[in-house]
């Protein structure tokens, strides 16, 4: 009797581990589409543009249950993962990290101080950027949209689409855009 129960327990542990997101040495969740850069935002924006992608910064912290939710329940969905990989140049910032970040305005600070400068209070927070950002503004000022917190697959996917479609330029709020898309997706 013990053998079938033990085998079942091992299979369940393997199945649960399949859905666990990778964790880096810094304690943050990692995704294959994240870029390891020098965190110079002007250079990152130029590289994103060269690849025909949009720059996206994701601020996270060690032990964040909402970051875990995004990395285990939302980002692994094939449609979302492919969309991010195809359309975004993603740079991860550690809310309490010490790696230097150079902002669009030229100021260089450790991640933890840059996050304070940007007044980002929650994780995950995702900042989205246009193809051009003035050199006299911070990332917080240059972002076309900010997504604070964890959201479900439909909201997240629709936000990514709204950014790529430049919905922020159309005058249609994200909420209205999302409501229309969500109605279609729910059919």
PLM region spans:
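Thiol-based oxidoreductase modules, predominantly thioredoxin-like and allied folds used
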Residues: 35-37, 77-109
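N-terminal "domain-start" segment that seeds a small globular fold
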Residues: 21-44
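Non-catalytic, surface beta->alpha helical segment in thiol-disulfide oxidoreductase systems
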Residues: 116-171
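Short active-site neighborhood of thiol/selenol oxidoreductases, capturing the structured segment around
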Residues: 51-65, 90
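Sec-dependent signal peptide recognition
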Residues: 2-9
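A short beta-strand-turn-helix
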Residues: 36-55, 84
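Detector for the c-type heme attachment site
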Residues: 68-72
């Amino acid at each position: 009797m013990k053998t079938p129960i033990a085998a079942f327990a091992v299979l369940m542990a393997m199945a649960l581990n399949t859905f666990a997101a990778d964790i880096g040495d810094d304690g943050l969740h990692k995704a294959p589409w994240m870029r390891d850069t020098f965190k110079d935002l002007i250079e990152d924006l130029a590289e994103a543009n060269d690849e025909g992608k949009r720059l996206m910064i994701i601020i996270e912290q060690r032990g964040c249950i909402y970051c875990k939710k995004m990395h285990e329940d939302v980002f692994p969905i094939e449609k979302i993962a492919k969309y991010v990989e195809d359309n975004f140049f993603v740079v991860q910032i550690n809310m309490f990290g010490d790696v230097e970040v150079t902002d669009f305005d030229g100021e260089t600070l450790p991640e933890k101080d840059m996050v304070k400068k940007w007044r980002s209070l929650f994780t995950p927070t995702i900042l989205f950027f246009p193809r051009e950002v003035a050199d006299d503004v911070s990332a917080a000022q240059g972002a076309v949209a900010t997504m604070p917190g964890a959201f479900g697959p439909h909201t997240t996917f629709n936000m990514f689409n709204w950014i790529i479609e430049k919905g922020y330029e159309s005058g249609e709020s994200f909420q209205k855009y999302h409501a229309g898309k969500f109605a279609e997706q729910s059919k």
